[in-house]
Amino acid sequence: MEFPEHGGRLLGRLRQQRELGFLCDCTVLVGDARFPAHRAVLAACSVYFHLFYRDRPAGSRDTVRLNGDIVTAPAFGRLLDFMYEGRLDLRSLPVEDVLAAASYLHMYDIVKVCKGRLQEKDRSLDPGNPAPGAEPAQPPCPWPVWTADLCPAARKAKLPPFGVKAALPPRASGPPPCQVPEESDQALDLSLKSGPRQERVHPPCVLQTPLCSQRQPGAQPLVKDERDSLSEQEESSSSRSPHSPPKPPPVPAAKGLVVGLQPLPLSGEGSRELELGAGRLASEDELGPGGPLCICPLCSKLFPSSHVLQLHLSAHFRERDSTRARLSPDGVAPTCPLCGKTFSCTYTLKRHERTHSGEKPYTCVQCGKSFQYSHNLSRHTVVHTREKPHACRWCERRFTQSGDLYRHVRKFHCGLVKSLLV
């Protein structure tokens, strides 16, 4: 005997408990914002929270602090509402912010939907689109359809779905439609690029300038970006703006310097290591002789490892984004003077204004490429290092992005993953 309304009732009761703070056994911190929630719901909806609570000791699970440079409080609030309601509201909030938060939390169904939105937006803004009524060279990409992950009886009852997934409509006869590419950015990479990337193995990027030599202005970079990062297409529309500031000339680094950083670990042990080492920068005594050194792409300081460089970059991004604010004292929602869009806080409005002005304040010292958002620069740095820090625990194959590792595990080790999630 089935009770199709049971799933909807369960979500409704959990939502009421969260609003009242009843039986909430954890608190998620995003900047200064606090979100009480239930661990079971977070772990069921997010791979990030599942791994966090699985690896953390029992006494340190009450508080979870997310990276405020990637996840904004309004975006996480929308994702938290989705976990408890089965609905995702993208109104009055930049899709890029929701995509960044969903990628960080490994909520891949939301990642697919947000990328589809951005792809459709880019196609609508492309001046090369065919006129209405003209036959396109290729059929348009199908738009993901929301489907409930419940039994058929629950769909008849029109209840809010507990889990959602993006499903493509059945393929019609004729030439095959183009597919939405599965990019390798789903943990940190936050936007789009057409076409899949082929995995290539490169040695670490070691530059050939002597350590004691002075930098020469106008020198050509020795390492070029051979392919755009998946995150860089979110700035494609703004790159056409005539007000885009010129890129500074690239500055070569010293011999033996490896430019790069390592993505933040998802496990509890790595998070504890990051918290213990926060704020500690490498001095000249710590660098020591021998071994590859890492250079900061923003200030050119040297560090003994990519982990210490990651800590240093986080301090940079906190300084640049420290002007984050909430609603104005009079309670009026911040509004863009150019397009009239309203935002939940002035910080998101400031980020949105970059799409109009073309401002790209974050610049890679190695190749001179500029980015609108700090996390895009962090992910772009991996292009120079060719690092592959994400290793499959079952076959030891390594990947540059955690999204590649996720799809590899889902394709080749699906049975093992299901056994872990039980």
From Swiss-Prot:
**UniProt xrefs under Gene3D superfamilies:** Classic Zinc Finger (3.30.160.60), Potassium Channel Kv1.1, Chain A (3.30.710.10)
Q: Give the boundaries of each C2H2-type zinc finger.
A: 294-316, 334-356, 362-384, 390-413
Q: Which CDD domains match?
A: BTB_POZ_ZBTB42
Keyword Chloroplast in annotation:
no
Kindly give the InterPro entries that the UniProt entry links to this protein. Answer: BTB/POZ_dom, SKP1/BTB/POZ_sf, Znf_C2H2_sf, Znf_C2H2_type
- Please give one Pfam family short name: BTB
Its job? Transcriptional repressor. Specifically binds DNA and probably acts by recruiting chromatin remodeling multiprotein complexes.
Say which family it is in. Belongs to the krueppel C2H2-type zinc-finger protein family. ZBTB18 subfamily.
Protein name (record):
Zinc finger and BTB domain-containing protein 42
What is the organism of origin for this protein?
A: Homo sapiens (Human)
Q: Highest lineage ranks of the organism? A: Eukaryota, Metazoa, Chordata, Craniata, Vertebrata
